[in-house]
Amino acid sequence: MRLQDIDVTGFETLLLDRDGVVNRLRPDDYVKKWEEFEFLPGVLEILKAWNTHFKYIFIVTNQRGVGKEIMSEEDLKHIHERMISEVKNYGGRIDRIYYCTALTDSDINRKPGIGMFLQILRDYPDIDKAKCLMIGDSDSDIKFAKNCGIVGIKVI
């Protein structure tokens, strides 16, 4: 399914994976700096359209490149600041980005672990889990949604 084809009716909170959903994947590599970041076609348009639909829009992303010291956390924060700015300039929004830099899959914060979702619920206690939608491009993203007890949709 393509991002543009998803029916978001009835959902108030959107969780998006970053790499492969918002931006182009770098095969066997990481997006280490802004110059390597490339929005996928149609993403800016759909985020603009969804701006008024969703109460909250979050990014939840595993960023193992920081844990591997291929890039710094400051590099990651700079990429995210620029991404949020570009989305905002286009008329969309991202309310907050949650990321995990852990190397081990056993870390609760690393998807499919539920740590990032638990943090979202702590930070935004008015969120209704029944009205949350997770969109990702990997089996791990969909397993994350299932583990959180929310709807997950896989895009290709």
Swiss-Prot record:
<feature type="site" description="Stabilizes the phosphoryl group">
    <location>
        <position position="61"/>
    </location>
</feature>
<dbReference type="InterPro" id="IPR013954">
    <property type="entry name" value="PNK3P"/>
</dbReference>
<keyword id="KW-0479">Metal-binding</keyword>
<feature type="binding site">
    <location>
        <position position="137"/>
    </location>
    <ligand>
        <name>Mg(2+)</name>
    </ligand>
</feature>
<comment type="pathway">
    <text>Nucleotide-sugar biosynthesis; GDP-D-glycero-alpha-D-manno-heptose biosynthesis; GDP-D-glycero-alpha-D-manno-heptose from D-glycero-alpha-D-manno-heptose 7-phosphate: step 2/3.</text>
</comment>
<comment type="similarity">
    <text>Belongs to the gmhB family.</text>
</comment>
<dbReference type="GO" id="GO:0046872">
    <property type="term" value="F:metal ion binding"/>
</dbReference>
<feature type="site" description="Stabilizes the phosphoryl group">
    <location>
        <position position="111"/>
    </location>
</feature>
<feature type="binding site">
    <location>
        <position position="19"/>
    </location>
    <ligand>
        <name>Mg(2+)</name>
    </ligand>
</feature>
<dbReference type="Pfam" id="PF08645">
    <property type="entry name" value="PNK3P"/>
</dbReference>
<keyword id="KW-0378">Hydrolase</keyword>
<feature type="binding site">
    <location>
        <begin position="61"/>
        <end position="64"/>
    </location>
    <ligand>
        <name>substrate</name>
    </ligand>
</feature>
<feature type="binding site">
    <location>
        <position position="17"/>
    </location>
    <ligand>
        <name>Mg(2+)</name>
    </ligand>
</feature>
<dbReference type="InterPro" id="IPR006543">
    <property type="entry name" value="Histidinol-phos"/>
</dbReference>
<feature type="binding site">
    <location>
        <begin position="17"/>
        <end position="19"/>
    </location>
    <ligand>
        <name>substrate</name>
    </ligand>
</feature>
<dbReference type="InterPro" id="IPR004446">
    <property type="entry name" value="Heptose_bisP_phosphatase"/>
</dbReference>
<feature type="active site" description="Proton donor">
    <location>
        <position position="19"/>
    </location>
</feature>
<feature type="active site" description="Nucleophile">
    <location>
        <position position="17"/>
    </location>
</feature>
<comment type="subunit">
    <text>Monomer.</text>
</comment>
<feature type="site" description="Contributes to substrate recognition">
    <location>
        <position position="110"/>
    </location>
</feature>
<dbReference type="GO" id="GO:0045227">
    <property type="term" value="P:capsule polysaccharide biosynthetic process"/>
</dbReference>
<keyword id="KW-0119">Carbohydrate metabolism</keyword>
<dbReference type="InterPro" id="IPR006549">
    <property type="entry name" value="HAD-SF_hydro_IIIA"/>
</dbReference>
<dbReference type="InterPro" id="IPR023214">
    <property type="entry name" value="HAD_sf"/>
</dbReference>
<keyword id="KW-0460">Magnesium</keyword>
<keyword id="KW-0963">Cytoplasm</keyword>
<protein>
    <recommendedName>
        <fullName>D-glycero-alpha-D-manno-heptose-1,7-bisphosphate 7-phosphatase</fullName>
        <ecNumber>3.1.3.83</ecNumber>
    </recommendedName>
</protein>
<dbReference type="GO" id="GO:0005737">
    <property type="term" value="C:cytoplasm"/>
</dbReference>
<feature type="binding site">
    <location>
        <begin position="110"/>
        <end position="111"/>
    </location>
    <ligand>
        <name>substrate</name>
    </ligand>
</feature>
<comment type="pathway">
    <text>Capsule biogenesis; capsule polysaccharide biosynthesis.</text>
</comment>
<dbReference type="GO" id="GO:0016791">
    <property type="term" value="F:phosphatase activity"/>
</dbReference>
<keyword id="KW-0972">Capsule biogenesis/degradation</keyword>
<dbReference type="InterPro" id="IPR036412">
    <property type="entry name" value="HAD-like_sf"/>
</dbReference>
